[in-house]
A protein has these predicted regions:
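Short, Lys/Arg-rich, polar N-terminal cytosolic tail immediately upstream
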Residues: 1-11
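Terminal, non-globular segments
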Residues: 12-498
Length: 499
């Protein structure tokens, strides 16, 4: 066998193995969770699609329907019916397209043969995989961000007006997908300025100014909308102010370090000699800004304003940057002929470590609202059995919350998506004087004369009210049974011993 024949066979082996690994990974990490239960925010998507963005109950969270994303699940459900799988299809397709663009950008910015490695580096990040089966705007946002950078690079390479317009269109769309994506516009400015200053582009300053001015005009309506909503920002804070440790963890340094150390060890053990040239400065600037701008800006905004927006899903736009950073540091030790074997090793590791192999069929989110609602149905409760339902949304506070809050409504959208039998009693998101006053009234007038009642909601909320009702003198002697097989959703059944 000649050396050329051996190389050809080796090449054909990787050309078969890598697509197979990718299909297996996408099947396990993306496709299999598609039919699992919605989590809270996805049920919000269902509410917006079914009731429209102008439903009066959405006034408590006006930022929720402000996204062009909802056009996609609305179209999908109109074509294929309403189901978990259908609502998630737009995100699945968006992330597949984003993965393709990231691979193409890796070829342009790092190495022509680094595409597979970059793709599997993306799949190594759980937040990246999560978006593919999530009926929320983040998958579309990742695709639009990738498209922006792809066309920005092409425009700065060619100076063609057509490429400039192809950049402006998704760039004008990005902020309309989610208002929290504003820091990403710094990536466009930093990369463009780098190439203009170093004269690494045929694009002239005047032409660049025209293109960015056009983009600015397109974004003005969104800017006014964002400024109006900012006045209410404090009412929607769901996380504490981030620490420096939170910032460091958000950068996914583990992936970067593992890729660099693993490839370096392999190169030392196998005596590889990297044959690529150092990355151009502009490529390094683009990768670094993609990786760092979103987390750094949201960290600074949170600390300066006191309104924390440092939420993991708001940072997902930076994950492809982390994957490209991992590919970049690995490229310093990889000969051109070794990219595919290394990508295969990374892909196998991703499938092994991220596959949720403790479950036969992986969940999308650790919230089985569908299973919890089914459990309540299996209890065969009478139509008058009280079912106490705390809202899963932080906005459910007095005075917006009240015991006679009208249904269907956004704050209790889970009751419309996964209905439960019984007489529904609505509780707020968290404890308050008004909530406890209503609970005392309910306990003395309704629960005391019932044979049983149910608590149904998030684990922390149900746990609080279980302890609260256990301490009521009128319920002394009652027993309760907890059902905790639904992730962070819980069902508790209270029984009267002699009824």
């Amino acid at each position: 066998m000649t050396a050329g024949t051996a190389e050809l066979r080796g090449r054909s082996l990787w050309d078969v193995l890598l697509p197979l690994l990718l299909l297996l990974a996408l099947g396990r990490l993306w496709l299999m969770p598609m039919g699992s239960s919605f989590w809270v925010d996805e049920m919000g998507t269902v509410f917006v699609v079914q009731h429209g963005p102008r439903d009066p109950s959405l006034s408590v969270a006006p930022q929720v329907p402000q996204s062009v994303y909802y056009l996609l699940p609305r179209a999908a459900s109109a074509l294929f019916g309403s189901s978990e799988f259908t609502y998630r299809v737009p995100s699945l397709l968006a992330m597949a397209a984003a993965l393709f663009l990231i691979a193409r950008l890796a070829a342009r910015l790092i190495h022509p043969r680094g595409t597979w490695f970059a793709a599997f580096a993306c799949l190594a990040l759980r937040g990246f995989d999560y978006q593919a089966a999530d009926a929320r705007p983040y998958g579309l946002g990742t695709l639009v961000a990738c498209a922006c950078l792809w066309f920005l690079v092409r425009w700065l390479d060619s100076a063609a007006w057509r490429e400039a317009l192809w950049f402006v269109v998704p760039a004008a769309l990005l902020w309309r997908v989610h208002l929290i994506f504003w820091p990403f516009y710094l990536v466009f400015g930093i990369y463009t300025a780098e190439r203009l200053i170093r004269r690494d582009t045929p694009v002239a300053w005047k032409r660049a100014a025209v293109v960015f001015a056009l983009l600015g005009v397109a974004l003005l309506p969104v800017l006014f909308q964002a400024l109006a909503l900012y006045r209410q920002a404090g009412a929607h804070v769901i996380v504490a102010l981030p620490s420096v440790r939170d910032l460091v963890l958000s950068l996914k340094l583990g992936l970067v370090v593992v890729c660099e150390a693993g490839v370096w060890l392999a190169s030392r053990a196998l005596r590889w000699r990297a044959d690529g040239s150092p990355l151009p400065r502009s490529s390094r600037i683009l990768i670094a800004s993609w990786w760092l701008c979103q987390p750094l800006c949201l960290f600074a905004f949170s600390r300066l304003t006191g309104n924390s927006v440092f939420v993991a899903r708001y940072l997902w736009l930076a994950l492809p940057g982390a994957a490209l950073a991992a590919t970049w540091v690995a490229s310093r030790f990889v000969p051109a002929t070794r990219w595919k074997p290394l990508a295969a090793a990374l892909g196998a590791g991703v499938l092994l470590l991220n596959g949720q192999w403790d479950r036969g069929w992986p969940w999308h989110h650790n919230s089985d609202w569908r299973g919890a609602a089914r459990k309540i149905q299996e209890l065969r409760l009478g139509p008058d059995t009280p079912v106490i339902c705390p809202s899963p949304f932080i906005e459910a506070k007095p005075p917006v919350w009240r015991p006679d809050y009208p249904l269907p409504g956004f704050l209790y959208t889970h009751l419309g998506v996964y209905p439960v039998p019984g007489q529904i009693w609505l509780f707020p998101f968290e404890d308050s004087a008004e909530a406890e006053g209503f609970a005392r009234q309910l306990s003395g007038q309704t629960l005391d004369v019932s044979k049983s009642f149910v608590l149904y909601g998030g684990q922390g909320q149900v746990g609080f009210w279980k302890d609260w009702f256990n301490g009521r003198p009128e319920l002394a002697g009652w027993s309760n049974e907890q059902f905790r097989t639904f992730g962070d959703v819980e069902v508790v059944l209270f029984h009267h011993p002699s009824r």
